[in-house]
Amino acid sequence: MSYNSSYIYEHLEPEGFIPDEISLISKGKNSRSFLIKKENKNFLLKYYKTDDFIKRNRLKAELNFLNLMIKGGFKNVPIPIKFNIEKNWILLSWLNGNNIEKINKSHIRKLIFFINELQSLRKSELINTIQNASEACFNLNDHIKIVFSRLNLLEKRLGYLSFLPSDTYEKFK
């Protein structure tokens, strides 16, 4: 699938959203992300792959989770502006930020705080409004295992992860 500018305009114009500028941000395994500029405002446009071997709709899953977080009081969550389930795209408000080049203790603390906040949603009736994600976690240990599983993949790609105490990391390998 070619996600060129004319392809994107084809999808956004019928929705009444005509971008001034379109730039590719990333080509991930599950989606393509674009920075969309319109009237001096930034937006994020994501196209999800349709050939998902998991056979679940990633767009619906993300949309449901974003709505859960918004209803749950999270403030640093992109807001869905427009979406098209059939064409597999979503337009979101833009959140300013920077890429993390090197993980430090502050990043880890923020991640732990975020996971704790997510855990608070478990007690909410809102949690029953979404399906489980492919890496759904229902307790802190599940979150920790997922994080260390991802760190293991990162270590294989980048080498030793010096920001973690080796004895802590070894327990989860």
Give the positions of each predicted feature.
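A conserved alpha-helical element in kinase catalytic cores
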Residues: 45-83, 102-114
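Active-site catalytic-loop/activation-segment of kinase and kinase-like phosphoryl-transfer enzymes
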Residues: 90, 131-173
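ATP-binding glycine-rich phosphate-binding loop
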Residues: 15-38
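Catalytic cores of nucleotide-enabled group-transfer and carboxylate-activating enzymes in metabolic
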Residues: 46-49, 86-89, 116-124, 135, ...
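Juxta-kinase regulatory segment immediately upstream of eukaryotic protein kinase catalytic domains
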Residues: 1-23
